[in-house]
Amino acid sequence: QYEGHAAPPEEILKSSPFVWFKDALDGYDYLVEQGYDEIVVAGLSLGGDFALKLSLNRDVKGIVTMCAPMGGKTEGAIYEGFLEYARNFKKYEGKNQETIDNEMDHFKPTETLKELSEALDTIKDQVDEVFDPILVIQVENDNMIDPQSANYIYDHVDSDDKDIKWYSQSGHVITIDKEKEQVFEDIYQFLESLD
């Protein structure tokens, strides 16, 4: 997992998208060191963007993006989503509302989100350099990103082997939502199609 994730929200602000991408590269390199030579990279949300970028830096057999942002309403939605995540995390920690409000008044994720926005712009500009087989997965009613990001990825990758799948009953975190079993089956079928 990326540095600062699944931790108090202040921890994520001590990191950056550049560190997270290095975490993805390190994960790939670890698999190679373990003897794996046919690696498919998959990622949810920002992880999907990193899967695309990783394919430009390492030899991959295929790519799966799930609800990966490419711009549009993404920056503001990520900011609001991150504030909501921070509030919920603080509630989960058992803090009272007054403490949460006080901590949130001092919680300013703008620099990290600015770096994230710049990283997304760079990845968007390089999508046309992706030529590996790809499965693009997107929910129709995504509350975090612009669902048209999926069409952008699909339309701009330079892969001859590409597919896009849409899901109408799930939210942004599709891997734990109503259609997760169908998503897993679609990914399995994609993996089986790679020779």
Give the role of each language-model region.
Residues 43-47, 51:
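Gly/Ala-rich beta-loop-alpha elbow adjacent to hydrolase catalytic centers
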Residues 64-75:
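Active-site nucleophile loop of the alpha/beta-hydrolase fold
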Residues 169-195:
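Catalytic active-site module of serine/aspartate enzymes centered on a nucleophile-bearing elbow/loop
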